[in-house]
Amino acid sequence: MNECVTVTGTIVDDTNGRNSDGVRHEADGDTHGWLRPDPQFANLLDNGNRTAENGDLVFEIVCHYRVTQADAKPSCSAFGDHTVIPPVGSHVAITGTFVQDTNHQRWNEIHPVSKILVVP
């Protein structure tokens, strides 16, 4: 874990349509989006992804949205992300740091995301 990876897959909406862009807008300014990885990356999913994240890989872009969480405001005060998140259904390559989120149900994620590219 904690290595830079590039994963291909399809952006999916696990918000059940609550957000038009298909990603959750976190209070700390981060995105919480979901990638259905291509078969060759299925090994990146763990039990937390399967049980808590609908079998998808989470991706988080830091400081992407307005920050409302007080302790996160200093971190994003001098930085604002301008990554374009492709629409749900887009086949993409996401590059970033591969980690396990141990604060929740121990799912794997790409956090932070460095780059998202639409690919064929």
Locations of regions flagged by a protein language model:
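OB-fold single-stranded nucleic acid-binding module
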Residues: 5-6, 11-120
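Short boundary/loop segments of OB/S1/cold-shock single-stranded nucleic-acid-binding domains
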Residues: 1-3
